[in-house]
Amino acid sequence: MLADVAAASTEVAASSARLVKIERIATLLARSAAEDDTQAVAVIVSWLSGELPQRQIGVGWAALRTLPPPAATPSLTVDDVDDRLSTIKAVAGKGSQATRAGLVHELFSAATDPEQKFLRHLLSGELRQGALAGVMADAVAKAAGLPAAEIRRAAMLAGNLPAVAAAAVTGGRAALADFRLRVGRPVGPMLAQTATSVDDALQRLGGTAVLEAKLDGARVQIHRSGCDVSIYTRSLDDVTHRLPEVVEATLALPATELIADAEAIALRPDGRPHLFQVTAARFGRKDPGDLGPLSVFFFDLLHVDGRDLLDLPTEERFGALDALVRQDQRVDRLVTTDTVAAQEFLERTLAAGHEGVMAKSPHAAYEAGRRGAGWLKVKPVHTLDLVVLAVEWGSGRRQGKLSNIHLGARDPDSSGFVMLGKTFKGMTDAMLEWQTQRFLELADGPTDGYVVHLRPEQVVEIAFDGVQRSSRYPAGMALRFVRVLRYRDDKSPAEADTVETVRRFYERD
């Protein structure tokens, strides 16, 4: 029942103890397995991970702002809600927005108050309860009675923990045999931790690192079997039909079968990268014909002609890649033990218009779907002093705290502020306590709604990775990957950074 999931979500969010979270989720999964409901197991894992199996269903916060009166008693099952969400996603054509709104109203009319709260947080992307991938994998293992390492390995190779959970909890160890590296089935990409500098990276990697240019493009995973090529994004969406140049480049390689990591990027005639949005536009179009070409640069090889390379060290995988792909189609690379040489490589990469560098251990295996210690990213940190324009009430562990802040830059022309994004990243518990009290004092209107609007008086220093084009905000720009560093009580709003300062970052990016 949906009521059971909502109750479990509340309990998981209320606890900071990892073992308590694992036990509560495992109990819920085991109950669904006992009812032989494989679909429900997969859906529950998705939901409690804060995700929808349908990914996006075309329902924004506006449709969730005003809800119908809740039902008195629970009646919705997990499968019923999942089917309804699939129906909402499938709505298209003229009048689709109104149709979706009607279907959302019907769904919420059938939900009790706790169920409505759960669904609203889930659909708005605000279900933050501390049930991260590691916790969820351990909960699946406990429910299935299997070692967590087996669940993680299967999820790594499947790129899909919900599917692994459904198989393991209902079918046991034998059901995991199907989850192996397979051409045509994407795996979760290996992710990088962050290093503060190339010197920090070298030290953490034991003194020797393989440095790579970190291109500001779109990461893709490429699968080839004979003449068939499939291309997936880092979130495992199939974008093959949107990237014909990548298909062509892959078919030109001297291999029959392969799985490779690569970066697709739009380059200017002089070889410098276009703005990230130019590359990203290709991933949002069904017909790429009216947009510029993309280049592809390979940087890792997971499988080639019947041979799995996942568990091999970096240097061996790169050796296999070098034997397969021409140098001008590979990401620039330097193996070094020298901090000066590493810093020069970083500076050359930045001067060429790229994001920074990746530093990789020559001995690390490919940890698919994990943020491994063998990969470190080094990028310059940009900071801005902005003004908090509004703030949202939190959920889960942040229930009762003002959490997600709306950020604005100063606009000298209008003597006001222009919104550039939102963030709840980087906030400590002490900071949440402080800002809740502070922002209630600055409230400019009611404080019982989801969003509390503020008098623009509080300056905050934030770090960000870049600026991208956005139609969501009046300035046409949005900050990327924003984190709070500290509140600047020593600065007045008149000292906040201007829209023009942000625009210079945008033009440079």
From Swiss-Prot:
Domain of life (superkingdom): Bacteria
Catalytic activity: ATP + (deoxyribonucleotide)n-3'-hydroxyl + 5'-phospho-(deoxyribonucleotide)m = (deoxyribonucleotide)n+m + AMP + diphosphate
Record-listed ATP binding positions: E212, R219, R234, E263, F299, R371, K377
Ligase keyword on record: yes
SUPFAM superfamilies linked: ATP-dependent DNA ligase DNA-binding domain, DNA ligase/mRNA capping enzyme, catalytic domain, Nucleic acid-binding proteins
Family: Belongs to the ATP-dependent DNA ligase family.
Entries under PANTHER family matching the protein: DNA LIGASE 1/3 FAMILY MEMBER, DNA LIGASE-RELATED
Official protein name in the record: DNA ligase B
